[in-house]
Amino acid sequence: MAELAKSAVLVSSCTDDLLGDAKQVVVGPNQEDLHSAEAVLNRYSTVGFQASNLARAFSICEMMLTPQSPSPSLMPTEGDQASESPVMVQPTLFVGVTANLFGTGCREAIRFLCTECVPLPNGVEPATPLDDMAGISCDGTGALKPSPCDSRALIHVLVVSGGAMEHDIRRACESYKLSRDGAEEEGEQFHHPVERDRSRSKGTDCHFGNVRYNSSGVASRNLFSCVMRCLVKRLAEAQRKEKANREAAPIPEAYYDVCSWAITPSTLWYMAGLWMADIFTEALQETGEVTDEKVASEEGLKRAKSTVLYWAARNGVPIFSPSLTDGDIMEFILTAGDTGVPLLQLDLVADIHRLNRLAMRSRRTGMMILGGGVVKHHVCNANLMRNGADYAVFLNNAQEFDGSDAGARPGEAVSWGKLRLDSTAVKVYSEVTIVFPLIVVHVFVAWVRMMRSKGKENIRS
């Protein structure tokens, strides 16, 4: 018994082979590094704890921007005719974002990712061939069009939860404000339900965390409500035209889709992006904020350009919203019927098929998930359809002890097949607003500058 206890307690330290990659010495920024924020970030890999995980996220995001060969399972086998020179592809980058983050400064960082376009280097192909899925298609009469899925931006697919794009639009209508701390400002605590009800009836600000914005109902004549009503009205009219076109066309031999004119969330937000400048112009005049038509047009374009929607539509970034019905837009869709506007027919399933197909057709993929829940699950599940993503960066502060989707670590995604066995992934335990802007400026902004600098050098030579 004594020998058994001795052998259990006095175990030799593990060898270097068992330590794996645990060979870096822990060291922080030196005195010179402390004079530069960039130098400090460059030292994060050896700081330890979540700083080292953030440094790993930097590295993985750089990999996702780097042209490389397709995933091994998708490369030609011995029986196939392999090309003389291997194909190089730009990984398809799926980004999942929870709605609340669009109410924070992360929105501007996401807009940057949808706005900046850098041409692919010579000989490099997009990881995903052009989307040839049959969808809603119409002539130039103002009817519906599916989002093109041919992104020229830094990211290629954006998946959001319900309410995200409403925050995007609302912030182009009005400013969100920061409260001093947490949920309530000093002196604004409502200890009685009646006081809360009275406050809400007077239009007290809504809040999430320490972010506040003005609450308004569907019938309100403020700018946001006017924009949303105008959007729903345009969508209903476009759907009416699409339905008429479909009814007038001959019935195909294989007639499976009896509601082919239904609108998917990705189509809805794509059309919103295309119309955004005109909708703002119309709403500004309707509310009386601007009376001069030219000034309204200029202001409408300015506000449209401040949105993620505008740039995503302009640069071919599809926006999928699996939980669209959880957002503010549903209130405007449902109440539009009271004014004689036909209720929109929505199809959420077609978008799931399309999202999954985009992943399946991608020759190499990466995921960057901000938060958890529905966006994380749908992006990961889409990549499951291709035997897993090649890269992943998860940013959230959820724990795995309760089996939640948000709390799951990369190893759990590997067990499901959502990450490849040879994938490179990291989870950074942090509140997203702290680390995401750092990733954008340290990796994506730096990459854009580097590529444009190379482009100028090529022009000179």
Curated annotation (Swiss-Prot):
Subunit structure: Heterotetramer formed by a homodimer of the non-catalytic regulatory subunit DHSp and a homodimer of the catalytic subunit DHSc where DHSc appears to bind spermidine and DHSp appears to bind NAD(+).
Catalytic activity, EC: 2.5.1.46
Catalytic activity: [eIF5A protein]-L-lysine + spermidine = [eIF5A protein]-deoxyhypusine + propane-1,3-diamine
Listed InterPro entries: Deoxyhypusine_synthase, Deoxyhypusine_synthase_sf, DHS-like_NAD/FAD-binding_dom
Chief location category: membrane
Membrane topology term: Single-pass membrane protein
Disruption outcome: RNAi-mediated knockdown causes cell growth arrest followed by death, loss of DHSp expression and a failure to sustain infection in mice.
UniProt pathway annotation: Protein modification; eIF5A hypusination
Residues at which spermidine binds: E166, H167, E331, H377, G403, S404, D405, E412, A413, V414, S415, W416, G417, K418
Subcellular location: Membrane
Family: Belongs to the deoxyhypusine synthase family.
Protein name: Deoxyhypusine synthase
Ways its activity is controlled: Allosterically activated by DHSp. Inhibited by spermididine analog N1-guanyl-1,7-diamineoheptane (GC7).
Gene Ontology molecular function: deoxyhypusine synthase activity; protein homodimerization activity
Cofactor stoichiometry and binding remark: The binding sites for NAD(+) are contained in the regulatory subunit DHSp.
Keywords: Hypusine biosynthesis, Membrane, NAD, Signal-anchor, Transferase, Transmembrane, Transmembrane helix
BP GO terms, sorted: peptidyl-lysine modification to peptidyl-hypusine; protein heterotetramerization; regulation of cytoplasmic translation; spermidine metabolic process
Cofactor: NAD(+)
Transmembrane segments: 428-448
Active site, renumbered: K418
Role played: In association with the non-catalytic regulatory subunit DHSp, catalyzes the NAD-dependent oxidative cleavage of spermidine and the subsequent transfer of the butylamine moiety of spermidine to the epsilon-amino group of a specific lysine residue of the eIF5A precursor protein to form the intermediate deoxyhypusine residue. Regulates protein levels of its regulatory subunit DHSp. Required for cell growth and survival.
Gene3D superfamilies: Deoxyhypusine synthase
GO cellular component terms listed in the entry, alphabetical order: catalytic complex; cytoplasm; membrane
Species assigned in the record: Trypanosoma brucei brucei (strain 927/4 GUTat10.1)
